[in-house]
Amino acid sequence: MTRLAFCDDDPNIHDQLTALLEKYRTQRKADLECTAFRSPLDLLAAIESGARYDILLLDVLMPAEDGITAAKEIRQYDKTVHIIFLTSSTEFAVESYVVGAYFYLLKPIWEDSFFPLMDSVMAACRRAEQ
């Protein structure tokens, strides 16, 4: 089972990701468990309490704490999680790779770009398990 968490404060993006991930899971018959967070502080609290994920989808621009800062903190607990940043701005692309981002996906999120990215990161997770 691949464990994925996503964190985005925008309710519309939150709903869109939920629908896309469900469609992906159904179409690809993916063994994927998804957990949603609206705040990076809640995600960090879960990780600090022992939750582990294989894939994280993080919004970059959030009010409580930005996704890049959250990723730096997450890396203190988990060096191997595949982090994909989601944002409407290219401004933080270089900085995202400093924290070991797997990918930097620009919003809006479209199925034709999201599904191949998910295929790639799911394959990377399978390779990491071997």
What do these predicted regions represent?
Residues I109-S120:
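C-terminal output helix
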Residues D10-T35:
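Two-component/phosphorelay signaling modules centered on CheY-like receiver
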Residues S39, D66-T69:
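Acidic catalytic/metal-coordinating carboxylates
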Residues I68-K79:
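Short amphipathic alpha-helix used as the core "switch/output" element in two-component signaling
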Residues M62-P63:
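The feature encodes the CheY-like receiver
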Residues A36-I55:
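Acidic, metal-coordinating helix/loop segments flanking the phosphotransfer/catalytic sites
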